[in-house]
Amino acid sequence: MDFLVLFLLYLALVLLGFVMICIGSKTHYLQGLISRGAQVFSYIIPECLQRAMLSVLHYLFHTRNYTFVVLHLILQGMVYTEYTWEIFGLCQQLEFSLYYLFLPYLLLIVNLLFFTLSCVTNPGTITKANELLFLQVYEFDGVMFPKNVRCPTCDLRKPARSKHCSVCNRCVHRFDHHCVWVNNCIGAWNTRYFLSYLFTLTASAATMAVVSTVFLVRLVVMSDVYLQTYVDDLGHLQVVDTVFLVQYLFLTFPRIVFLVGFVVVLSFLLGGYLCFCLYLAATNQTTNEWYKGDRAWCQHCPHVARPPAAEPQAYRNIHSHGLWSNLREIFLPATACYERKEK
């Protein structure tokens, strides 16, 4: 099968999986399909192998560890090594602007800075000492965050918008999610660093994709390959088309073409996730609240606390106060002053 067909199939499967994960988290029908699929596989895969797989998955996703942090740095190192080893030198020979070529390195430095800050910054851990301060930050909506609820694990009163992270075993103020790639919770005090990290990572992948693609296109134009003809398997003379050009470039520069494919896919995935995170920031929602929002007033969820009403009410986000106020709350979190007082 042609490389281009395989790559497009791979791209379609990756994007389909990404979309299904996003939609499946909000769609009970897809969750049911995934659950039934898991049951089918449980009859096929030996029990000992199932236990081993579950143990590995539990370690990777339900305990704090540096596996994905190391994997992140290895992948980033491999991509930049290939860029430096081949693409940078070849682009210099084609007289690319040095500002253009050094941009991915500048983005890498900034990205590593925000990556480190996302990893090491306290996301807003709630303790006995700061419990009262956090209780005053956000208003309780009585739906998703009712008053006078205690965390059964930490034995602390739960401030509005907080959540207990089972991975880190702590309650986090304005909890968004636990990110395995930074081995840390994303909360009130490090969301700004996480968004900046995600933006620079997306920008570096997109910039590298553009530089590499422009290099390949310029190479094709300079060599006049696109003006040539070739004889196909049936002995017919054919004009060079896109499929042939991709095959030709893959045989000539396999590592560069593979890199282009990887960073293009990565740019789409990161770009989509970045847009989702920016939407949450603009509307003053967290990932946890977005996920729980549709179920807050669900009549089929009796475990959800809701006041008696004559007719069902729709969940309303009471924490959104306009675009600029919402963004200011993330990038200049009010809780930073509480942290200084505590010290």
UniProtKB/Swiss-Prot annotation:
Location, primary (coarse class): endoplasmic reticulum
Location of the motif Di-lysine motif: 340-343
EC number: 2.3.1.225
One biological process term in Gene Ontology: protein targeting to membrane
Topological domains annotated Lumenal: 1-2, 89-95, 218-255
One GO location term (cellular component): endoplasmic reticulum membrane
Top-level division of the source organism's lineage: Eukaryota
Recorded topology in the membrane: Multi-pass membrane protein
Catalytic activity: L-cysteinyl-[protein] + hexadecanoyl-CoA = S-hexadecanoyl-L-cysteinyl-[protein] + CoA
Disulfide-linked positions: none
GO MF terms held by the record: protein-cysteine S-palmitoyltransferase activity
UniProt entry keywords in alphabetical sequence: Acyltransferase, Cell membrane, Endoplasmic reticulum, Golgi apparatus, Lipoprotein, Membrane, Palmitate, Transferase, Transmembrane, Transmembrane helix
Membrane side Cytoplasmic: residue ranges: 24-67, 117-196, 277-343
Active site (UniProt): 179
Sequence intervals crossing the membrane: 3-23, 68-88, 96-116, 197-217, 256-276
Domain DHHC: 149-199
Intracellular or extracellular location(s): Endoplasmic reticulum membrane; Golgi apparatus membrane; Cell membrane
Family: Belongs to the DHHC palmitoyltransferase family.
UniProt note: domains: The C-terminal di-lysine motif confers endoplasmic reticulum localization.
Assembly information from the UniProt record: Interacts with CPT1A.
Primary role: Palmitoyltransferase that could catalyze the addition of palmitate onto protein substrates including the D(2) dopamine receptor DRD2, GSK3B or MAVS. Mediates GSK3B palmitoylation to prevent its AKT1-mediated phosphorylation leading to activation of the STAT3 signaling pathway. Also catalyzes MAVS palmitoylation which promotes its stabilization and activation by inhibiting 'Lys-48'- but facilitating 'Lys-63'-linked ubiquitination.
PANTHER family noted in UniProt: PALMITOYLTRANSFERASE ZDHHC4 (PTHR22883:SF466), ZINC FINGER DHHC DOMAIN CONTAINING PROTEIN (PTHR22883)
Protein name stated in the entry: Palmitoyltransferase ZDHHC4
Gene name for this UniProt entry: ZDHHC4
